[in-house]
């Protein structure tokens, strides 16, 4: 089975501010996130609207990205501005967009993963090729810690509502 998180927006209403070291490490553009581009900055504003609750902001950003992008594997990873214009991205490109939008909204986050997986889920006992990596992200809630979030929905249930199972 798996670990399930039962955190609600009410649980984080009184979360402490981010520690300074988190601001300096997890709210910066340290991975070609195009956080200074107009399209990414506008998407960051549009994604959260007037929401102030950290967990609801995270849901809003996730839903925005899941609704704006369709999944597609590419041989290389483009920057979030290009991905938002194109509307199609791999899991790594979804992560880039999510990182940029979260960080611009004051949510500390980081990339996790890069593990190898088979080209088809039912295949086992085969050599894994570098073409099949997977990445997702973790976001930080003061007082609770790092929470994982799936990078993309594989276009399951496109246009939402997106199930909360994507917070692993």
Regions found by a protein language model. Give the residues of each.
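Acidic low-complexity segments
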Residues: 1-85
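Generic short beta-strand segments
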Residues: 2-3, 91, 113-117
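Active-site nucleophilic cysteine motif
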Residues: 57-61, 87-102
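Hydrophobic/aromatic-rich core segments of domains that either
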Residues: 96-168
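A short glycine-/small-residue-rich loop at the edge of a beta-strand within enzyme catalytic domains
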Residues: 52, 82-89, 93, 124, ...
